[in-house]
C-alpha cells in the first residue's frame, strides 16, 4: 500500500505537464501551473514542505522570484516566520543587496532588501525547481553577505540529471524536494 507521501508524489507528477521546446529548443519545461487549479493539492504540498522544514526551526524563508512565491508564502505562514522575497534586479522598492550569477548565455542579477536578513538568522531557501542550482546558489551568497545561516533548501521538484545539489552542498547539505526527475 502506498504511503501518503508516495500518493502525493504520484498526484503531483500526474498533474505537472511537460512543455517541449520551452523556453527554447531542446528544453522540456516542467509546467507546475496545473497544480494551482487544485486547492486541496496545493494545501497538501504546503503541508508536506512545512512538515519537512518545521523540525529545522528556520527563522525565515527566502523565496525565489517568482514561482518560489507561489507556495513559499503559505509555507512561511504555516511556520509562523517571515518570507524574504528574492527578486530579479529592479523589482524591490527599498535599498537592496544584489548578487550576479552566470546563465548559459550571459548573466542575471537577483536582489533582496538590505534589512531582510539579520546576522545569525537561520534561513531556509525555497523555490519551485532545482535545476542547475545557479539561482539558489546566488541566493545563498546573498544570505551569507547578510551574515545569515542557511539551514535548508526546499524545492517542489528536483531535476537530478542537472546536478544542482552539487552547487548548493558547500552552503548547506540539507536539500529537500518533494519529487525528483
Curated annotation (Swiss-Prot):
What EC designation does it have? 2.4.2.7
Disulfide bonds listed in the record: none
Tell me one GO biological process term.
Answer: AMP salvage
Q: Which InterPro entries match?
A: Ade_phspho_trans, PRibTrfase_dom, PRTase-like, UPRTase/APRTase
Q: Which Gene3D superfamilies match?
A: 3.40.50.2020
Q: What class of enzyme is it?
A: transferase
Coiled-coil intervals:
none
This protein's pathway: Purine metabolism; AMP biosynthesis via salvage pathway; AMP from adenine: step 1/1
**SUPFAM superfamilies documented for this protein:** PRTase-like
Query: GO MF terms on file?
Result: adenine binding; adenine phosphoribosyltransferase activity; AMP binding
User: What is the reaction catalyzed?
Assistant: AMP + diphosphate = 5-phospho-alpha-D-ribose 1-diphosphate + adenine
Note the Pfam families from the entry. Pribosyltran
One GO location term (cellular component)? cytoplasm
Its main subcellular localisation, reduced to a broad class, is: cytoplasm
| Localization, UniProt | Cytoplasm
Keyword Cytoplasm among UniProt keywords? yes
Q: Which key words tag this protein in UniProt?
A: Cytoplasm, Glycosyltransferase, Purine salvage, Transferase
Q: Which CDD domains match?
A: PRTases_typeI
The family line of this record is:
Belongs to the purine/pyrimidine phosphoribosyltransferase family.
Q: Give the quaternary structure.
A: Homodimer.
* UniProt-listed PANTHER family: ADENINE PHOSPHORIBOSYLTRANSFERASE
Q: State what this protein does.
A: Catalyzes a salvage reaction resulting in the formation of AMP, that is energically less costly than de novo synthesis.
* Record-given protein name: Adenine phosphoribosyltransferase
Organism of origin: Cytophaga hutchinsonii (strain ATCC 33406 / DSM 1761 / CIP 103989 / NBRC 15051 / NCIMB 9469 / D465)
Q: Which gene encodes it?
A: apt
Amino acid at each position: 500500500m502506498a504511503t501518503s507521501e508516495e500518493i502525493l508524489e504520484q498526484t503531483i507528477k500526474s498533474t505537472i505537464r511537460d512543455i517541449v521546446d520551452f523556453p527554447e529548443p531542446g528544453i522540456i519545461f516542467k509546467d507546475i501551473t496545473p497544480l494551482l487549479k487544485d486547492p486541496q493539492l496545493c494545501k497538501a504540498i504546503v503541508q508536506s514542505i512545512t512538515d519537512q522544514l518545521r523540525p529545522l526551526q528556520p527563522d525565515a524563508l527566502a523565496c525565489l522570484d517568482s514561482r518560489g512565491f507561489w507556495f513559499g508564502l503559505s509555507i512561511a505562514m504555516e511556520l509562523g516566520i517571515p518570507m524574504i522575497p528574492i527578486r530579479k534586479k529592479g523589482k524591490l522598492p527599498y535599498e537592496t543587496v544584489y548578487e550576479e550569477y552566470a546563465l548559459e548565455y550571459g548573466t542575471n542579477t537577483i536582489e533582496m532588501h538590505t534589512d531582510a536578513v539579520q546576522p545569525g538568522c537561520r534561513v531556509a531557501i525555497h523555490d519551485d525547481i532545482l535545476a542547475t542550482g545557479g539561482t539558489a546558489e546566488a541566493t545563498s551568497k546573498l544570505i551569507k553577505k547578510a551574515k545569515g545561516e542557511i539551514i535548508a533548501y526546499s524545492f517542489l521538484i528536483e531535476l537530478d540529471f542537472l546536478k544542482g545539489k552539487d552547487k548548493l552542498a558547500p552552503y548547506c547539505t540539507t536539500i529537500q524536494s518533494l519529487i525528483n526527475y
